[in-house]
Amino acid sequence: SLRVAQEAEGPRIVVCEVGGVIDLNRRDIRVTNPFLTIAGQTAPEPGITLIRGGISLRTHDVIVRHLRIRPGADGAAPKWGWEVDGLTTSGAHDVIVDQCSFSWATDENLSASGPRFDGGDTAEQWRQHTSRRITFSRNIVSEGLSNASHAKGEHSKGTLIHDNATQVLIVGNLYAHDHERNQLFKGGVHAVSANNLIYNPGNRCMHYALNASEWGAHPWQVGQLSIVGNVVRGGPSTRADLPFLIVEGQGDLDLYALDNPARHADGRAMQETGIISDREPKIRRLNASPHWPAGFRARPSSEVEAWVKAEAGARPWARDAVDRRILQEVRTGTGRIIDDEAEVGGYPVMDEASRPFVEADWDLATMTRKDGAPS
């Protein structure tokens, strides 16, 4: 019924009268019809958890809240070719993904993607034909599987923002135990990353990269990033010389960075930037953000860790065992990057529960309960 509701046409709100685990059986849900709200908060306990698949958004005007998406390797052999995102946008626009939980993807846990050069010959045309106006807020993005079934081998990845994506806001998320792409921004991206908590990144923390071989004869575009009020804490899997931000490849970067404390597990401050390139890309430091969202105020970094721990993830009023464990590992400085969901207990097993949805109890404009209860 979830798949049918998302494939329907016209403005619609998906509410849930049954809570439990939905096995996608390696068939991703592809949303191609716009004006969709998925209100996972309406489900009775234990909420909605998707396993063995993910969601691909290929449309516009979509809101997704309070889902847990845990694809897993599903027993596939290393490099077998089972490559699945938790949730990805592909050429989508006007999308909000808020207070969801993603883990155990074999590709990215959460990403915004699409074609690089569709629509014409100019950068503005390219930007209008890939993902844009995307907000990822207050999610838990954890335990991307490392040496699992992705054909390339190691692929524990948090978030990818693909080339030429614009008006992207990544705010208030918890990244934990992801080897790389604790936000990777590809060439020409315009994005704001604010107030995220990143724990135990492995080989890459934040990362900007324009790969010349992927751009061919197209003129390189300057990336524009605003990185404000993020907190990074190294952990058991973090390499000893990891910098906060790596700039890689050939493209130049306009960077506004402010109030981003980043420390290794032993208390050493991380180097702010590192460059990996055979052509030294230029990092131009800005005194103000070039693309700050209207009305948005970043919190000071001193408030971020407590706020993210309290707010991030699906149904924080009734977290599942996976999210409780992740948060405990963040608190205690423990845990590690994993290769298979079986290393941490495997797919969740939950009793199914049902409860009728009473429309009169809900404000349909905000999808919150009128009595103030969380669900």
Please describe what each predicted stretch is.
Residues 3-10, 22-39, 46-65, 71-92:
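Extracellular beta-strand-rich solenoid/capping regions of secreted or surface-exposed proteins
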Residues 14-16:
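Solvent-exposed adhesion/ligand-recognition segments of exported proteins
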Residues 258, 265-267, 271-375:
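C-terminal functional modules
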Residues 18-21, 42-45, 235-238, 265-267:
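Acidic glycine-/aspartate-rich tracts in secreted/extracellular proteins
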Residues 10, 150, 374-375:
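Sequence termini and other peripheral, non-core segments
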Residues 35, 40, 60-71, 91-107, ...:
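Right-handed parallel beta-helix
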Residues 27-31, 49-58, 76-78, 85-91, ...:
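Glycine-rich beta-solenoid repeat tracts in large extracellular/virion proteins
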Residues 194-303:
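Aromatic sugar-binding interfaces of carbohydrate-active proteins
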